[in-house]
From Swiss-Prot:
Protein species of origin: Pyrobaculum aerophilum (strain ATCC 51768 / DSM 7523 / JCM 9630 / CIP 104966 / NBRC 100827 / IM2)
Family per record: Belongs to the HAM1 NTPase family.
Highest taxon of the lineage: Archaea
HAMAP family cross-referenced by the UniProt entry: Non_canon_purine_NTPase (MF_01405)
Name of this chain's protein: dITP/XTP pyrophosphatase
Gene Ontology cellular component terms for the protein in this record: cytoplasm
Length: 187
C-alpha cells in the first residue's frame, strides 16, 4: 500500500513512514503547494487541506496538522505552532513561560486522508508539560521542550523508537493505518 503525505518536512516524512511501516503502508512525499487554512482547530485545518489537495492530486493524499496548546498561555500557540516555532523558536516560547507555575500542555495531531472525495480524520492527543529548558538531541520542532505526562524525559530525550509509539502523531497515524488496513482499500 502507498499513500502520499503532503509535507515539506523530511523529519515528519520519516516519522510517519516509521509509524505506518507495521501496517505495510509506504509513504511518499507529495510535492504540493502549501495550503494555508486559518482556523483554531487542527481537525478543520487538516480536513479542508485534504479536500483541497484531493481535488488537485487525487486519492490517497494525507495531510496532518499539529497544534501545541499551552495552558498558561491560554492554549497558545495552538494550531499556529509551526509559525511560532519559525518566528520565536523554543527560546521565545520558554521566555513567554518565565515565572509560570502551570506548564501543562497538550500536543494534538489531526491526520486526514482523502479517498473518493471523502475525507476521514484521525486525532491523536498527548498531555504533558513544557520543560524549563530544551533537553535532548532527537526529534524536531518542540520535541526538546515537551515532556509527555507520566514521564520525565522530553520527546527529544526519549529517542525515535519510543516517541514513535507514544506521540500525538503516532496515535493519529496508527488510527489511520488501522483504518486503511481494515478496509482492504489496496487490494
Amino acid at each position: 500500500m502507498r499513500i502520499r503525505l503532503a509535507t515539506n518536512n523530511p523529519y515528519k516524512l520519516a516519522e510517519v513512514s516509521h509509524i505506518l511501516a507495521p501496517f505495510c503502508i509506504e509513504v511518499e512525499r507529495l510535492d504540493a503547494e502549501k495550503v494555508e487554512i486559518q482556523h483554531d482547530d487542527v481537525v478543520v485545518i487538516a480536513r479542508k487541506a485534504a479536500e483541497f489537495l484531493c481535488s488537485r492530486y487525487g486519492d490517497f493524499v494525507v495531510v496532518d496538522d499539529t497544534g501545541l496548546y499551552i495552558e498558561a498561555l491560554g492554549g497558545f500557540p495552538g494550531p499556529y505552532a509551526e509559525y511560532v516555532y519559525r518566528t520565536i523558536g523554543l527560546k521565545g516560547v520558554l521566555k513567554l513561560l518565565e515565572g509560570a507555575a502551570d506548564r501543562r500542555a497538550t500536543f494534538k495531531c489531526a491526520a486526514a486522508i482523502c479517498i473518493g472525495g471523502r475525507v476521514e480524520v484521525f486525532v491523536g492527543e498527548v498531555r504533558g508539560y513544557i520543560a524549563h529548558e530544551p533537553r535532548g538531541r532527537g526529534g524536531f520542532g518542540y520535541d526538546p521542550i515537551f515532556i509527555p505526562e507520566g514521564m520525565t524525559a522530553t520527546y527529544a530525550e526519549l529517542g525515535e523508537e519510543v516517541k514513535n509509539k507514544i506521540s500525538h502523531r503516532a496515535k493519529a497515524f496508527s488510527q489511520l493505518g488501522a483504518w486503511l488496513t481494515n478496509r482492504n482499500l489496496f487490494k
